[in-house]
């Protein structure tokens, strides 16, 4: 995680799925599930685990801070993990929340460690999920660079694009932005029926 605000030429995020010819039907089936992605990944694999890459204070990306309702870029608590199915990293997940709201509305976050965030969010009836936004992120996007660094590889060229989705969770008066980048290894796992 970087302590400096990251910029990217323009926001790739859209409220509708990209066309199937671009996004791919397989990826779309993973992206549109309304329930916990963690539960769906567990159902699609024989083993599942979370690898915590880092958690700490960081400035949000340029297209993120407004999602939290912040008037300007301000330090957030950021959490980055890999979701791993059958020992293959299949999702890079990036979460940000304003630090002041952690104690009041997201008290579990600081001690979550390698436990899945999705389980905590979907088990709490006071948490509401907002609409999804979707993107195809190319190799220049900071989250793709971080995902490839976590995998120990070199960032792909600007033409390599990874499907991603994000949504805002609300509890009380605070917001949490969760972004999930689908990694190539997810291609071998069939999404379970809509859960």
From Swiss-Prot:
Gene Ontology CC annotations of this record: cytosol
Enzyme Commission identifier(s): 4.1.3.40
GO MF term list: chorismate lyase activity
Gene Ontology process terms (BP): pyruvate biosynthetic process; ubiquinone biosynthetic process
Residues reported in the UniProt entry to bind substrate: 79, 117, 180
Pathway assigned to this chain's UniProt record: Cofactor biosynthesis; ubiquinone biosynthesis
InterPro entries associated with the record: Chorismate--pyruvate_lyase, Chorismate_lyase_/UTRA_dom_sf
Keywords associated with the record: Cytoplasm, Lyase, Pyruvate, Ubiquinone biosynthesis
Principal location: cytoplasm
Compartments (UniProt record): Cytoplasm
One Pfam family named in its UniProt record: Chor_lyase
Reactions mediated catalytically: chorismate = 4-hydroxybenzoate + pyruvate
UniProt family annotation: Belongs to the UbiC family.
Described purpose of this protein according to its UniProt entry: Removes the pyruvyl group from chorismate, with concomitant aromatization of the ring, to provide 4-hydroxybenzoate (4HB) for the ubiquinone pathway.
Protein name: Probable chorismate pyruvate-lyase
